[in-house]
């Protein structure tokens, strides 16, 4: 019964700014279906609206005003915004502020995931030199929360401890906590992220190829491509020399969501392994549009292979113009030196 109280809660007029930034109902419903949320769009919408208008100073009795909500619902609402941001690859500052507000509200309502995330946020802030002195009391409180949550085998806390060690490149400790997490849960999206990072640790180890492959395969099975494109790409690189067809399929998945690194890799794979110059040129052209220098190099090589000397000359001129950029100059000089024979061939073709 309480879940339907939302229908009778009077909602304030919807500000124009909120209408402009908040996603359409159809988009939100699609994400709610993906996340399998407990609340519907109509139950969430007035809360989203209230949160957008709420200032940090306001103390709103959320459970009294919206009796149907749980702290886990607030976290799911935050996940809706995170999913939207991930899929769109666009960050709107007001929606990002709403994510933070929702996290704080969930923590106020006693959600352990929210408390854990906020505690680790404090630790990350503490690492910045300019805030160390002012964060001593906060860091002490955050550490207390983390210790208590870890003692209760709180899943997210175990994972975030692993993440902290991973970021600090203390890989042996990161692996320990990641393995500990996977004993607690092994088939969730969070587990997918852990498998992905675990693979990055394992590939650095002696004879870690098979372990990394297994971890990344588990990762891409559990996570949608938008959240796992990095690990699709790393797995593809693992297969480049031994199983190029597998590598190609994985890279094409990455390309479908605009993962920048894969354009040149796909281009060189088509050029050097499959000898498909036209297809290689298509990938290189896509990379050239985002000014990936190596895609210019690859396109030049394709034109030379096809004896398309005009195309090769035009590409070479474009590369030389990019040489004015100091960051690119060294790479361009190496390219020009390594392609001396091809460049001589272009000069002969003019005669």
Swiss-Prot record:
Subcellular location: Mitochondrion inner membrane
UniProt keyword list: Membrane, Mitochondrion, Mitochondrion inner membrane, Repeat, TPR repeat, Transit peptide
GO cellular component: mitochondrial inner membrane; mitochondrial matrix
GO biological processes: protein insertion into mitochondrial inner membrane from matrix
Keyword Zinc-finger belongs to the record: no
InterPro entries in the cross-refs: TPR-like_helical_dom_sf
TPR repeats: 155-188, 260-294
Annotated S-S bridges: none
More info: Present with 736 molecules/cell in log phase SD medium.
Subunit text: Interacts with COX18.
UniProt function note: Required to stabilize mitochondrial cytochrome C oxidase subunit 2 (COX2) and to translocate the C-terminal domain of COX2 through the inner membrane.
Stated name of the protein: Protein MSS2, mitochondrial
Upper lineage: Eukaryota, Fungi, Dikarya, Ascomycota, Saccharomycotina
